[in-house]
UniProtKB/Swiss-Prot annotation:
Gene3D superfamilies: 1.10.8.60, Nucleic acid-binding proteins, P-loop containing nucleotide triphosphate hydrolases. It comes from Mus musculus (Mouse). Its main location: cytoplasm. It is found in: Cytoplasm; Nucleus. InterPro entries: 26S_Proteasome_ATPase, AAA+_ATPase, AAA_lid_3, ATPase_AAA_core, ATPase_AAA_CS, NA-bd_OB-fold, P-loop_NTPase, Prot_ATP_ID_OB_2nd. The lineage of its organism: Eukaryota, Metazoa, Chordata, Craniata, Vertebrata. The keyword Signal does not apply. GO terms for molecular function: ATP binding; ATP hydrolysis activity; identical protein binding. Component of the 19S proteasome regulatory particle complex. The 26S proteasome consists of a 20S core particle (CP) and two 19S regulatory subunits (RP). The regulatory particle is made of a lid composed of 9 subunits, a base containing 6 ATPases including PSMC3 and few additional components. Interacts with PAAF1. Keywords: ATP-binding, Cytoplasm, Nucleotide-binding, Nucleus, Phosphoprotein, Proteasome. Component of the 26S proteasome, a multiprotein complex involved in the ATP-dependent degradation of ubiquitinated proteins. This complex plays a key role in the maintenance of protein homeostasis by removing misfolded or damaged proteins, which could impair cellular functions, and by removing proteins whose functions are no longer required. Therefore, the proteasome participates in numerous cellular processes, including cell cycle progression, apoptosis, or DNA damage repair. The gene is Psmc3. This is 26S proteasome regulatory subunit 6A.
């Protein structure tokens, strides 16, 4: 009976199905697909041999790609060294004359000589060097062709003439000196009696730069420039300095006599360079003081100097309303002889806003003297209204001169503060100089 119990008992169908299910679950967990489980032993061996051969092929491919990668790295290193040698200074300065699109469509016959440079597709360039030689470059060089345009200044290799680097735009050194690096310290509060003029200047110059969207919402075009005119000493240049101090724009100060040059075309080139520099550093303001030096009415003259001044003014007219208007460049011009200016300068579209600076009235004169006396040690008994009544026909500069003369008189007598009598004596001093000047010019 014990031997009979040692014999294996046949498994039931339920137990066999459970084992098969367990095997399938383990196969799925190991990543073995159902297709492999249904394959025979010979098929599995054959599949394994195929996979081994594919692995060998992939390993050889990886080895080949690794060798190619190393060869490419060596080639890149070699080319980098060649570029470094070619980029050694000095460069030959050249100008880009023209950019050409090259796309050869004609097919060469079999056996014909083929010029590889002529078969390149893309951009080619024509340059003119500083030695006055013109070259055609089938290959531009190290600079992207999309970043080049005719007229650009570039540095090329002196042997191969390949473009190695773009150079900054060349401007006249006199134009660069026109840029105001240090901001003036004047403020609108330092100007007395010109509230209306300050408002007109802010509306025409400052507002279009700081709040451009207001003009776009209304659909109006802001003024291109402002002409400030009036007698000498009424605050035209002072207001321009205050405008330069209050805005963050680049400020270029030109003097009219500075644009009158001896050589033909030199003054016009200064005007072109000044506007080009202003466009590059936009937003910017160009202030032209003493505009009557170049803006006089045109007339027939046989003198070369007069014709050169007229050519300079024509270039200024062209820049004011050229073919490409620029709303980020504003022009402020000042003169005390508006009657002799050319009508072409005064028409709308060039200097749209005309701001008159009259002689200050009594209230304005009192305000001007108060402003210039703020930092002085002044006695409380000084009556500025009475001083303003005594300074009839005085401009702003003469009112300032009264304060300076009063301070000098107080200094002469060793006083520690300025009195009303000092101001009255200062008025007499300025009036005496004024009469002397009138008699001198008469």
């Amino acid at each position: 009976m014990q031997e009979m119990n040692l014999l294996p008992t046949p498994e039931s169908p339920v137990t066999r199905q459970e084992k098969m299910a367990t095997v399938w679950d383990e196969a799925e967990q190991d990543g073995i697909g159902e297709e492999v489980l249904k394959m025979s032993t010979e098929e599995i061996v054959q599949r394994t041999r195929l996979l081994d051969s594919e692995i060998k092929i992939m390993k050889s491919e990886v080895l080949r790609v690794t060798h190619e990668l190393q060869a490419m790295k060596d080639k890149i290193k070699e080319n980098s060294e060649k570029i470094k040698v070619n980029k050694t200074l000095p460069y030959l300065v050249s100008n880009v004359i023209e950019l050409l699109d090259v796309d050869p469509n004609d097919q060469e016959e079999d056996g014909a000589n083929i010029d590889l440079d002529s078969q390149r597709k893309g951009k080619c360039a024509v340059i003119k060097t500083s030695t006055r030689q013109t070259y055609f470059l089938p290959v531009i060089g190290l600079v992207d062709a999309e970043k080049l345009k005719p007229g650009d200044l570039v540095g090329v290799n002196k042997d191969s003439y390949l473009i190695l680097e773009t150079l900054p735009t060349e401007y006249d050194s006199r134009v660069k000196a026109m840029e105001v690096d240090e901001r003036p310290t004047e403020q609108y509060s330092d100007i007395g009696g010109l509230d209306k003029q300050i408002q007109e200047l802010v509306e025409a110059i400052v507002l279009p730069m700081n709040h451009k969207e207001k003009f776009e919402n209304l659909g109006i075009q802001p003024p291109k420039g402002v002409l400030m005119y009036g007698p000498p000493g009424t605050g035209k240049t002072l207001l321009a300095r205050a405008c330069a101090a209050q805005t963050k724009a680049t400020f270029l100060k030109l003097a009219g006599p500075q644009l009158v040059q001896m050589f033909i075309g030199d003054g016009a080139k200064l005007v072109r360079d000044a506007f080009a520099l202003a466009k590059e550093k936009a937003p910017s303001i160009i202030f032209i003081d003493e505009l009557d030096a170049i803006g006089t009415k045109r007339f027939d003259s046989e003198k070369a100097g007069d014709r050169e001044v007229q050519r300079t003014m024509l270039e200024l007219l062209n820049q004011l309303d050229g073919f490409q208007p620029n709303t980020q460049v504003k022009v402020i011009a000042a003169t005390n002889r508006v009657d002799i200016l050319d009508p072409a300068l005064l028409r709308s579209g060039r200097l749209d806003r005309k701001i008159e600076f009259p002689m200050p009235n009594e209230e304005a004169r009192a305000r001007i003297m108060q402003i210039h006396s703020r930092k002085m040690n002044v006695s409380p008994d000084v009556n500025y209204e009475e001083l303003a009544r005594c300074t009839d026909d005085f401009n702003g500069a003469q009112c300032k001169a009264v304060c300076v003369e009063a301070g000098m008189i107080a200094l002469r007598r060793g006083a520690t503060e300025l009195t009303h009598e000092d101001y009255m004596e200062g008025i007499l001093e300025v009036q005496a100089k004024k009469k002397a000047n009138l008699q001198y010019y008469a």
